[in-house]
């Protein structure tokens, strides 16, 4: 561990400087964000962030933990070969956690950095990823292998601590990777979500690593768990029922990290979470020509994507500022992006295109929407009981959703008792029609975000409603929580770490339309 001193913290407002000899980043202009949120991200898919998840669930010993996940590299068609979708060793993937006053300031207190390395067992073959049927993680048949290391950066004291390292399982090609699929048969579709760790496929089980410091990690390909009819939304809001899941059948790459709450100072608090990716650019140069950087020629890293709450950059920020969002930190959100949350154009479009000019949604002075998105960190109350989880749907024969889980979160009656102040949507029980004396927060987004939260419908209901006065909440849900006609993920979800479902099989794809 190396310490840089008190000046490190002050420098954070300019750049989240890297630790352990790494070079500063984020002070250089950058390019993009999320599934397809900003124009320039289409040129850099492996650095493109898709979704951030943060929720409270217990670890293997029953202790509450903060589960974090970052999805990248969207729109992976499983049927395309050779399968070249991989993490990028020239990209730093980072999940940031803000504590205390850092939440309102929009700056990270801690950063968890994932860095990858790629190797081949043999390059004297055209078989890039698979030399045969892969029986176990990193066996002789897995030609392309990736490993990763995780570093925790603490901006309070300028330290970097090695958390651990792991190996990435193979992508799901089909016959080369049979154990991902039903009946361990490469001709069958990928396994749907499961309820226990022993039911996970072999490759996923082998790739989950638990470190002596209490962290648990996974990095690898998964089914894209985001669901929504994005095509119809951007086709002049011509919503349809049933809708078509725009991410149905596609894979992505996921990094999951389970963080002990002792690492964050306990559970009597709210924390903020967001993520960034940064790409290695030209090697750094010393102005003197004799500096240390010239000797080691470390690359500079440029932030190319940022992701916090779902849909913000895609659904609220104007085109002229989308790339600005990608290259900035949440520290500037109040100055640059507050206007988009307080005066959401999407609400205006709902009134125009769906309401025919009638005011269905309030489109000015939305302090309630700004409380969610500004600064753009997912705020999560750690004081609650563990969240309820999505499985394979309500009433599914195997691995059904938890009792009380609602994809609509608070709008579906899914709430959790809050035992500590701090969350912007912490409501007194009497405001929810319950006996006075307690406080509650949403069971899912915008209190954290779970796999299975229907963020499209939640966002639309929030825009149609008036949440500005907690004592007089006005919930407007004319379509009963079904706006884009998509209510779940075709593969379901696991109810155990790493939670996102098995990657789709290239030979037998489920849900692609």
What are these regions (language model features)?
Residues 20-30:
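C-terminal segment of classical bacterial N-terminal signal peptides
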Residues 14-15, 25, 54, 412:
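Intrinsically disordered, low-complexity segments enriched in polar/charged small residues
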Residues 30-513:
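Surface-exposed extracytoplasmic segments
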